């Protein structure tokens, strides 16, 4: 499982001109599912999403996590993160999970996140989405579990 996370001042995702999720200060996480991803990868990814220290403390050091600051989490499915880009000028998606597995794993990650955080929002698997954000930093990390 892959996540591209960004520290944001605010973010939102729209599907068909309808807001499906919006957060204030927190983390926007684009999520890619790979073949073989299951409960161990989901559990680890959720630990990383909630515990990765990307928010500043009083001294200006990145020493606080999403859980520490009680921030929002916006999860957006993005299968293109799992693309194979090693050759040619066109990505191959053979390294991404099939849609049924991707949807299942994304939805389970979303459900599990909602049991641990009060502010969890999401995009819609398989939909064309428009994501708007105000990046804070910018601070962006690639996480893999």
Segment roles from a protein language model:
Residues 1-89, 104-145:
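N-terminal, polar/charged subdomain of small-to-medium soluble alpha/beta proteins
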Residues 101:
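Extracellular glycan-recognition regions
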């Amino acid at each position: 499982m892959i996540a591209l996370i960004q520290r944001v001042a605010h973010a939102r995702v729209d599907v068909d001109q309808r807001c499906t999720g919006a957060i204030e200060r927190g983390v926007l996480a684009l999520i890619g599912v790979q073949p073989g991803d299951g409960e161990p990868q989901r559990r680890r990814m959720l630990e990383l999403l909630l515990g990765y220290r990307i928010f500043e403390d009083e001294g200006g050091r990145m020493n606080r996590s999403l859980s520490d600051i009680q921030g929002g989490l916006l999860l957006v499915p993005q299968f293109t993160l799992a693309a194979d880009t090693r050759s040619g000028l066109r990505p191959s998606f053979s390294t991404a999970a099939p849609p049924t597995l991707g949807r299942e794993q994304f939805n389970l990650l979303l459900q599990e996140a909602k049991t641990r955080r009060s502010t969890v929002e999401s995009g819609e698997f398989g939909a064309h989405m428009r994501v708007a954000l105000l990046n804070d930093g910018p601070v962006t990390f690639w996480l893999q579990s």
